[in-house]
Amino acid sequence: MSIFSIVTAPDERLKQKSKPVLECTDQTRKFMHDMLETMYNADGAGLAAVQVGILLRILVIDIKEYDPVERPKDFYPLFIVNPEIIEKSTELVTANEGCISLPKQRIEVTRPESVKIRYLDYHGKSQELKANDWLARVIQHEYDHLEGKLMVDYLSNLKRDVVLRKLKKLKNNIV
């Protein structure tokens, strides 16, 4: 297993739209496992491939410790390839979010309370999943990454600029 470096804002790759995966191969599955290890290493709940510099429509999610919904034992981790949101609730919920590509930042984001997605699973089989609560939020957050959208994009221009300046300063002090 490999642990990848995390791409952090204001890196321009995070603003690009990811491309579909053509086929779920052994190489794709190894990459997803490496993404998962990287996510665990960064104490994340989810990770999009773009966050490790690969512009493919792949997500990994594991929130079993925080999910209020009782799920089958083998439900997590979720490997989600080429997701599309096919349904969103009209009920909106605002909650505080963090992101491993935006270190030390917490932002209030309003999102639909539930979503239904269609995707390919770990084996390349088509699946549908209706998610609500925290899982819906994590799916939407990670899906935004595939679309080149960050949680700071939900802020006003002024607030977004302040956060991005902080991140740039943080990045320059670290590198």
From Swiss-Prot:
Keywords: Hydrolase, Iron, Metal-binding, Protein biosynthesis
Co-factor: note: Binds 1 Fe(2+) ion.
Reaction catalysis annotation: N-terminal N-formyl-L-methionyl-[peptide] + H2O = N-terminal L-methionyl-[peptide] + formate
E.C. no: 3.5.1.88
InterPro entries attached to this UniProt entry: Peptide_deformylase, Peptide_deformylase_sf
Keyword Hydrolase assigned: yes
Cofactors that this protein relies on: Fe(2+)
Broad enzyme group: hydrolase
Gene Ontology molecular functions: metal ion binding; peptide deformylase activity
Single GO BP term: translation
Family matches, as Pfam families: Pep_deformylase (PF01327)
Stored Gene3D superfamilies: Peptide deformylase (3.90.45.10)
Regions annotated as coiled coil: none
Annotated residues for binding of Fe cation: 99, 141, 145
Similarity comment: Belongs to the polypeptide deformylase family.
PANTHER family: PEPTIDE DEFORMYLASE
Role, per record: Removes the formyl group from the N-terminal Met of newly synthesized proteins. Requires at least a dipeptide for an efficient rate of reaction. N-terminal L-methionine is a prerequisite for activity but the enzyme has broad specificity at other positions.
Name of this protein: Peptide deformylase
Organism for this UniProt entry: Rickettsia prowazekii (strain Madrid E)
Encoding gene per record: def
